């Protein structure tokens, strides 16, 4: 192939009709002039109504009920651990602390831990946690273990 037959980057151009200029409305009296494609008169010809405007109909945000009650800013969110998880991860029993639970991947660090009573436990465990449910304390003590609230 000869050098003069090769396509050069500066010779490339878009296909005819691929690039069209943005339509400028309201300039003169031709196609998109005068009313600029908005028809004649009325609200839509003069301005846009705000988003959510429904005419004379009661707006959606006023039709829906108000949010009632309140959120307690001092509520403590516990990470929960059930007894079936404790018996699976500590089958031989022993001391169960928050650090031990973190190292086994049962809870994350930085949030208080609450032990709940779902499941059964047979090994005697000494559990140290931030909170316990009554059923969890009952089952742990029945298995020969003890609980300590931090």
From Swiss-Prot:
Pfam families hit by this protein: Ribosomal_L27A
- List the PROSITE patterns: RIBOSOMAL_L15 (PS00475)
A GO MF term: structural constituent of ribosome
Which residues lie in Basic and acidic residues bias regions?
1-13
In the record, biological process GO terms are:
translation
Which residue ranges are recorded for the region named Disordered?
1-44
Q: Which domain of life is it from?
A: Bacteria
Instruction: State the GO CC annotations.
Output: cytosolic large ribosomal subunit
- InterPro entries tied to this protein: Ribosomal_uL15, Ribosomal_uL15/eL18, Ribosomal_uL15/eL18_sf, Ribosomal_uL15_bac-type, Ribosomal_uL15_CS
Tell me which UniProt keywords the record has, alphabetically: Ribonucleoprotein, Ribosomal protein, RNA-binding, rRNA-binding
In UniProt terms, what function does this protein have? Answer: Binds to the 23S rRNA.
What is said about its interaction partners and assembly? Part of the 50S ribosomal subunit.
Q: Which family does it belong to?
A: Belongs to the universal ribosomal protein uL15 family.
Task: Quote the protein name from its UniProt record.
Answer: Large ribosomal subunit protein uL15
> What is the species listed in this Swiss-Prot or TrEMBL entry?
Micrococcus luteus (strain ATCC 4698 / DSM 20030 / JCM 1464 / CCM 169 / CCUG 5858 / IAM 1056 / NBRC 3333 / NCIMB 9278 / NCTC 2665 / VKM Ac-2230)
